[in-house]
Amino acid sequence: MARRNSPEAIAARHAFRASYWNWRSFRAKQLPSLTLTSDPSLNRSIQSVTLEDGSDKFVHRNQLSVDAGLEIQQNIALTGGRVLLKTGLERLDMFTDNISSYKSTPVVVGYEQDLFGFNDLKWERRIEPIKYEEAKKTYIETLELVAAYTTNRFFNLATAQTSLEIANYNFAYADTLYRYAQGRYNIGTITENEMLQLELNKLTEQTNRLNAQIEVDDYIQSLRSYLGISENITLVVIPDDSIPHFTVDVNEAMQLAFQNNPDISAFERRRLQSESNVAEAKANRGFKAALYAQFGLTQSNEKLKESYRDPMDQQLVTLGIRIPILDWGVGKGRVKVAKSNRDKVYTELEQERMDFELNVAKIVKQFNIQAGKVAIAYKTDQTAQRRNDV
């Protein structure tokens, strides 16, 4: 019930759901995308045009342009580029001259690439799977922690119920002694001061009983709320007296911890993110260039069918460059900062990994002695019972 209804479990489900859709979005970026584009426009205006003799003249334009195109794009993670394949058709209607014409682009192949730039797709392919694996392990860990929290609330209530039983017994015992004291006082065998002391003991035990009952009610409310039980019911927990006899091997526990604990995935993610920041700082510091190349076929005609006959080839190549000449050390400083942060992360991860191993060993050691501690407590309880009977 707690794994389904507790606040921690509900929050963990929402967090994992968000991580899942982030993972789906990352996977979708690796797949081809298909896009339909269309930009119809109506132009009724007076515009200036340049004639063959170089003079300008205002002419009235009354035209409608309607186009549609299909485009497939695919990201290339290895290079960080993008390849595209598209086709389209455009119709132009000149209402003034009552002329219609078509322009077709049966096929166009293009490629876009940042040269010497930061390849975020490559780093995402390394980091995102680890982030998703970390999210899955975190969700499982949270559910296990919910079980542990529920167990703690269970035994808190069990302890409070035992304390209430002891408080009831102590009150009954103190009340009995006080009644006997009243009888003895009436016959003059004890002093008034002795009787008043026993009455004070009774009142103290009565207060202890009230406090124990309040504590039980509080723990019932805490457990009921954590389990998602809205009904106002009384819970009575019955702990099991049997103790499983087994020990945990330190090496096996260490191996399972490295396999299943989300902290290990977080260590690797943080390391890769620090290296990614260094690579990005280096790429943004120096020479940058962007290449775009497009090759395809195109044709135009006043008839739709004829616009697809004997298409002509078309090419478009653009190259943009950016060369920092003087930045007063800004780029170099950013690289130094990124490297310093990376080295800091390395140091932190080394220490946290060592602490992780020591913590696992400590928890295993503490767990393995629990059975012995419970056995000693049980023996102590039996001895106290025998002493009380005597």
Language-model segment annotations:
Residues 38-109, 237-247, 279, 292-323:
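Small/polar, glycine/serine/threonine/aspartate-rich low-complexity segments that form flexible
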Residues 126-256, 366, 370:
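Periplasmic alpha-helical coiled-coil/stalk elements that build and connect Gram-negative outer-membrane
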Residues 106, 176, 248-252, 316, ...:
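Generic alpha-helical secondary structure signal
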Residues 11-26, 142, 146-168, 178, ...:
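Amphipathic alpha-helical coiled-coil segments
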Residues 4-8, 17-33, 69-101, 109-127, ...:
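A glycine-/polar-enriched beta->alpha junction
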Residues 1-67, 114-116, 120-123, 127-129, ...:
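Bacterial Sec-pathway N-terminal export signals of envelope proteins
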Residues 286-290, 314-316, 362-364, 371:
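Active-site lining segments that contact anionic ligands and/or coordinate catalytic metals
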